[in-house]
Amino acid sequence: MIGRLSGTILEKQPPEVLIDVGGIGYEVQMPMSCFYELPEVGQAAVICTHFIVREDAQLLYGFNKKSERELFREVIKANGVGPKLGLAILSAMTASQFVLSVENEDITTLVKIPGVGKKTAERLVIEMRDRLKGWGEGDLFTPASDAAASNAEIQKYSSARAEDEAVSALIALGYKALQAAKVVSQVVKPEMSSENIIREALRSMV
């Protein structure tokens, strides 16, 4: 099992990050709520990981905190919820927002997540509300949506490329191509990085 990676960020292509650990590059998929908080390319990072082995692939899912990883593990235990949907859930909302949605039985919010229909949302609430009892708030989770975007987050590439990357990331998270392109065009502003475009796009759809 690979439970933790400590190294240097080589590439950031939402929702995937490439991190160099001792000369080996690991591709790690991260929910956008965690991706937003990553350091810049070339800087050191520590990522808590969940390792999945399939017949056709070996996949790493990454998180900034152990608590976020543990929530992901609880989510994918739910009937009909796999890693891809778990990634989409924690990309559409922060860990704390998901916990509150389950506790409040907020089906309306949950069904806005790509891949989550009414039955899946109801199943998540039924299966997870007891398991999530005792999960704290405040310091346990730090909502990425509350963090102001800094100048360091503005990437040095054109707006067109940033928009294309944002659309590709949304499609990878389960949104339809037309829906992704439409929402990106609605939220994009001059000089926005792809990460900030994705953040605003996801926020507008939940």
UniProtKB/Swiss-Prot annotation:
Q: Which UniProt keywords apply?
A: Cytoplasm, DNA damage, DNA recombination, DNA repair, DNA-binding
Biological process (GO) annotations held by this record are: DNA recombination; DNA repair
Q: What is its main location?
A: cytoplasm
The record's region (Domain I) falls at: 1-64
Where is region (Domain II) located? 65-143
Output the Gene Ontology cellular-component terms: cytoplasm; Holliday junction helicase complex; Holliday junction resolvase complex
SMART domains per the record? HhH1
Q: Which InterPro entries match?
A: DNA_helicase_Holl-junc_RuvA_I, Hlx-hairpin-Hlx_DNA-bd_motif, NA-bd_OB-fold, RuvA, RuvA_2-like, RuvA_C, RuvA_C_sf
Select a single GO molecular function from the record's annotations and give it: four-way junction helicase activity
> What ranges does the record give for the region Domain III, renumbered to this chain?
158-206
Question: What role does this protein play?
Answer: The RuvA-RuvB-RuvC complex processes Holliday junction (HJ) DNA during genetic recombination and DNA repair, while the RuvA-RuvB complex plays an important role in the rescue of blocked DNA replication forks via replication fork reversal (RFR). RuvA specifically binds to HJ cruciform DNA, conferring on it an open structure. The RuvB hexamer acts as an ATP-dependent pump, pulling dsDNA into and through the RuvAB complex. HJ branch migration allows RuvC to scan DNA until it finds its consensus sequence, where it cleaves and resolves the cruciform DNA.
Under NCBIfam families, the record lists: ruvA
Q: Summarize the subunit comment.
A: Homotetramer. Forms an RuvA(8)-RuvB(12)-Holliday junction (HJ) complex. HJ DNA is sandwiched between 2 RuvA tetramers; dsDNA enters through RuvA and exits via RuvB. An RuvB hexamer assembles on each DNA strand where it exits the tetramer. Each RuvB hexamer is contacted by two RuvA subunits (via domain III) on 2 adjacent RuvB subunits; this complex drives branch migration. In the full resolvosome a probable DNA-RuvA(4)-RuvB(12)-RuvC(2) complex forms which resolves the HJ.
Name the chain's protein. Holliday junction branch migration complex subunit RuvA
Q: Which organism is it from?
A: Photobacterium profundum (strain SS9)
